[in-house]
Amino acid sequence: MMSKLGVLLTICLLLFPLFALPQDGDQPADRPAERMQDDISSEQNPLLEKRVGERCCKNGKRGCGRWCRDHSRCCGRR
């Protein structure tokens, strides 16, 4: 009887951590499409617009990406 309980306890202790811990596929970093759907980018957030504009201007014309050209005066916005 005790050996059966020991075997059952050993099996439970070995199997439980394998299922209780998150697997690698469950991490948000492994699912970029889902992560990007929930992400609020700085392009859509007016609170971050000033900081992004400052970063564009610090880099001069070299740092002018598409967003900077559309939103920053130093990159050609009128």
UniProtKB/Swiss-Prot annotation:
Instruction: Name the domain of life this protein comes from.
Output: Eukaryota
Q: Where in the cell is it found?
A: Secreted
> Which cysteine residues pair off into disulfide bonds?
C56-C68, C57-C74, C64-C75
Q: Which residues form the propeptide?
A: 23-51
**What does the record say about tissue specificity?**
Expressed by the venom duct.
This entry's Gene Ontology molecular function terms read: ion channel inhibitor activity; sodium channel regulator activity; toxin activity
Endpoints of the signal sequence: 1-22
A GO CC term attached to the entry: extracellular region
Identify residues that carry Cysteine amide.
C75
Q: What are the Basic and acidic residues biased-composition ranges? A: 28-38
Outcome following mutation: E54A: 13-fold increase in blocking SCN3A (K(d) is 15 nM)
Chief place of localization: secreted
Instruction: Determine if Secreted is one of this entry's keywords.
Output: yes
Q: What is the effect of changing V52A?
A: 3.5-decrease in blocking SCN3A (K(d) is 710 nM)
Keywords carried by this UniProt record:
Amidation, Cleavage on pair of basic residues, Disulfide bond, Ion channel impairing toxin, Neurotoxin, Secreted, Signal, Toxin, Voltage-gated sodium channel impairing toxin
Q: Which InterPro entries match?
A: Conotoxin (IPR004214)
- Coiled-coil regions listed in the entry: none
Instruction: State the residue spans of region: Disordered.
Output: 26-46
Miscellaneous comment in the UniProt entry for this protein:
Negative results: does not or very weakly inhibits rNav1.7 and rNav1.8.
Which family does the record claim for this protein?
Belongs to the conotoxin M superfamily.
Domain note: The cysteine framework is III (CC-C-C-CC).
Q: What does this protein do?
A: Mu-conotoxins block voltage-gated sodium channels (Nav). This synthetic toxin potently blocks rNav1.4/SCN4A (Kd=0.34-3.6 nM), rNav1.2/SCN2A (Kd=13 nM), rNav1.3/SCN3A (Kd=200 nM), rNav1.1/SCN1A (Kd=360 nM), mNav1.6/SCN8A (IC(50)=1.8 uM), rNav1.5/SCN5A (IC(50)=9 uM), rNav1.6/SCN8A (IC(50)>30 uM). It is noteworthy that the toxin is 50-fold more potent on mouse Nav1.6 than on rat Nav1.6. The block of SCN4A is very slowly reversible.
What name is this protein filed under? Mu-conotoxin BuIIIB
The organism's lineage?
Eukaryota, Metazoa, Spiralia, Lophotrochozoa, Mollusca
